[in-house]
Amino acid sequence: MDRTVNQVALENDEREAKNTWRLVFRIATLLLIVMTLAFSAAALAYSMEASTPGDLVGIPTAISRAEEKITSALGSNQDVVDRIYKQVALESPLALLNTESIIMNAITSLSYQINGAANNSGCGAPVHDPDYIGGIGKELIVDDASDVTSFYPSAFQEHLNFIPAPTTGSGCTRIPSFDMSATHYCYTHNVILSGCRDHSQSHQYLALGVLRTSATGRVFFSTLRSINLDDTQNRKSCSVSATPLGCDMLCSKVTETEEEDYNSVTPTSMVHGRLGFDGQYHEKDLDVTTLFGDWVANYPGVGGGSFIDSRVWFPIYGGLKPNSPSDTAQEGRYVIYKRYNDTCPDEQDYQIRMAKSSYKPRRFGGKRVQQAILSIKVSTSLGEDPVLTVPPNTVTLMGAEGRVLTVGTSHFLYQRGSSYFSPALLYPMTVNNKTATLHSPYTFNAFTRPGSVPCQASARCPNSCVTGVYTDPYPLVFHANHTLRGVFGTMLDDERARLNPVSAVFDNVSRSRITRVSSSSTKAAYTTSTCFKVVKTNKTYCLSIAEISNTLFGEFRIVPLLVEILKDDKV
């Protein structure tokens, strides 16, 4: 037992010895660490020359200075952020617009040089002011939420009148046609010396110009090139289009009345002309015997054409030769368009019979009056590669005056309401190579035209008529998916007579508040409208070129009516 006790005591002594050495080691280690820290602090103090407590007084000052430097640096960073925002949000878009302006200028100049090489001209190529770049031929109002009729026209604004007026009581200026591209606009009208009903001789005024902004910020149209085609040719029903080579114009050459032309057996002569950037005009007769071999009368649609895919597209209407291939292809075809919430009470069979008869009005000897579209390649050679598209009458109503428009990436054909359907029509149009396809139209029920009974403004049933007046709508309000919501236009707000011109914004059912030209008894006739935006101010304007009665100097005066499009946020 003693051995056991001794063994336990020995183990306890060994354990105490180990604990003692551990304690000694720990104390030595701590002393070594403290000494190391002391030497390090002394070395640091010596290196910083902060050997006295008084030297520590400068630390708060140093901290304050450091704080000021940090604040200044943060301020500089904010300046950088502000400059970046300004660059991204403001300067870069403007720079892009200026770049687009330069590009468009270069393209126009190049086009002019190509044209100038053919006519030995040395004049410069025109282009709109940079304020308008990106605001012409675009979807101007893209809005899915607002009521279309919350947009409305301002009062008419005073601006430079770029349209010549008659200078005698017997003078007549009629049938305006207008088109505007990203670089320039084109305008034309007919000039008759002895009253508006004379068909034997006339002049054709043709002008090329650009949009400018005055020093006070006002919009004005500046005519740069113009010509009055005063020769032995009697050009009628002319349509104009702004193309990269100038102002292309399509006219019929007329020597007889419209009724006589429809009763003839040969197509109407047509001419493709161009006013170049140098102010020189050239034209070429089309081979109508080949192009319009199935027609007895053929006319441009009066409204502007459109430059699409290297070709210029013009609206066409006229009479088909009975039993010709084109006439036979349309036999039995018809379409009936209905008024909004106002159904025709006639029996369906009777409606169909009247709809079919509407394409062959008695006024033109029972000839089928047909809609068509003509495309011509734009090159230094006039009248090159013309191609005629005749759409089926399962889509279009009786042929009538019209206009081809391009807004954004969408193309449209306006068709005058010469037949029974009074509301304005815009057919979506797609192009494939050299031909066009028309689709079911947008209709604007409140945008009507006056007409003779039974095809007056409120008419709702198919009938055979030749009536109405040319008043085209311009696509203004779009959905985000590019479908059309609303248009701007100047209509004649009367049931039967060509009276009371008013401007408004229209959706498919109703219209906005109106801007009236004058009293409800004011006589008027054709109107053609085009809208654009001043990108610099983000203001949208619409131009309505309207034939307004003028009792002192000629029967009509063509007036360019300018409005700004405003918005009523309460609607």
From Swiss-Prot:
Organismal lineage: Viruses, Riboviria, Orthornavirae, Negarnaviricota, Haploviricotina
MF (Gene Ontology): exo-alpha-sialidase activity; host cell surface receptor binding
Region Involved in neuraminidase activity, residue ranges: 234-239
Question: Which leading EC class covers this enzyme?
Answer: hydrolase
Record flagged with keyword Disulfide bond: yes
User: What's the EC number here?
Assistant: 3.2.1.18
Name of the featured protein: Hemagglutinin-neuraminidase
Sugar attachment sites are: 119, 341, 433, 481, 508, 538
Q: Which organism is it from?
A: Newcastle disease virus (strain Miyadera/51)
Function description = Mediates the viral entry into the host cell together with fusion/F protein. Attaches the virus to sialic acid-containing cell receptors and thereby initiates infection. Binding of HN protein to the receptor induces a conformational change that allows the F protein to trigger virion/cell membranes fusion. Neuraminidase activity ensures the efficient spread of the virus by dissociating the mature virions from the neuraminic acid containing glycoproteins.
Q: How does it assemble?
A: Homotetramer; composed of disulfide-linked homodimers. Interacts with F protein trimer. Interacts with host CG-1B; this interaction inhibits viral adsorption and replication rather than internalization.
